[in-house]
Amino acid sequence: KGLDPSVWVAEDSILALPDIRNIYTKDIAPNLETDMPVIVTGDFNSCSHLDWTERAKPLHHGYGPVAFPASRYMLENGFKDSFREKNPDEVAYQGGTVAAIYGQMQMSRIDFIYYKGGLKVLSSKIVRTAPEIDYVWASDHAAVLTVFEVE
């Protein structure tokens, strides 16, 4: 049951999606009334449908495509995923961020930088720990680093 993508999507719909909808309504939407760029970052506790594609099935133990609702919600509201914009090949650039210090699930991205309006992505990468400091890293997540140019 835990390896059933329909369960993942259902859980995402119950847990991650309501959180992002609430944040969107209270904190993001009011800032969209101007022409200023908006950047939304963080641990979404949800994977991306842009990563779990038909092409990437072999990387995800044969599962995919998976339509994770939280990532779809952001794109449906006009935001772009900065990492996937700059690294569109989800097979060559998996960009895993979760459990980074343990070497597990490194193909799963749950940390994102979404943006819209007046920005151009110059670069975007995942920053992992150096092997010699694996157990000193402040988080079990890798960092997402995106450099933008304001247009």
Predicted regions: what is each one?
Residues 1-151:
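Active-site regions of metal-assisted phosphoester/phosphodiester hydrolases
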